[in-house]
Amino acid sequence: NFKVTPASSENHGPVRVANTWHFAYEDGTPYYSIGTTCYVWDLQSDERIAQTLETLKNSAFNKIRFCVFPKHYDYNLGEPRSYPYEGTPVDSSVLTKENFLEYTGKTEGNHWDFTRFHVEHFQHIEKCILALRDMGIEADLIVMHPYDRWGFSQMTIEQDALYWKYVIARFAAYRNIWWSLANEYDLFEHKTVEDWEGYAKI
C-alpha cells in the first residue's frame, strides 16, 4: 500500500540525452556533468563514507563513479566491508605493496557461491546511492572491472548474466543511476568484444 504524490521541486527525474549532444533531466532542466571517481568509497568504513559524502557536499561535483565489486590495487589493499557473494575470500594477511601484483582474479583460495548473492552488500550500496540522490548527485556504477584478487573478474558468462540480472533489478529504479559496463574492459582476457556487446544490450 503506497501513495503517489507529485515530484518535489528538487526532484527533476533521471538524466537523459537531450537534442543528441546534451544532457537534461526528465523535466527538461539542463544537466551539466561535473564528475569524479572514487572507486570503492562505498565499501569503506562508515567514517570514511561519511567523510566522502561531506567532501562531495562541499564540492561542485554532481556525479561520482564507483564500483559494485571491491577493487584490488596498490593504494587499496585492505579488505572491503562486504563481498557481493556468500563465501570466503583469499587470505590477504601477507599482501604488501611489493607483492600485490602476484594476486589476480585467478588467485587460489577464494571460495564463493556465485548463485548466492550477499544481500547486505547490495543493500549497503543502495544506501550509498540514496545518500547521493538526496544530495543531487548522480551515481555512475562501474559494474565490472579487472582489478581483482577475489575471482569476480573470472566468472563464467552464465555467472555474469545472473549478476547483471540481479544488479539491474536492484538498482535500475533509482533515478540517479548511470551504468558503466566496465573499467578497462580490454584487460579481461577471457571476454570477447561480442560478450561486451551482449552486456551492453541488456
Describe the residue ranges of each PLM region.
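Ligand-binding face of N-terminal immunoglobulin V-set domains in extracellular IgSF glycoproteins
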Residues: 1-8
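Active-site mouth of glycoside hydrolases
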Residues: 12-202
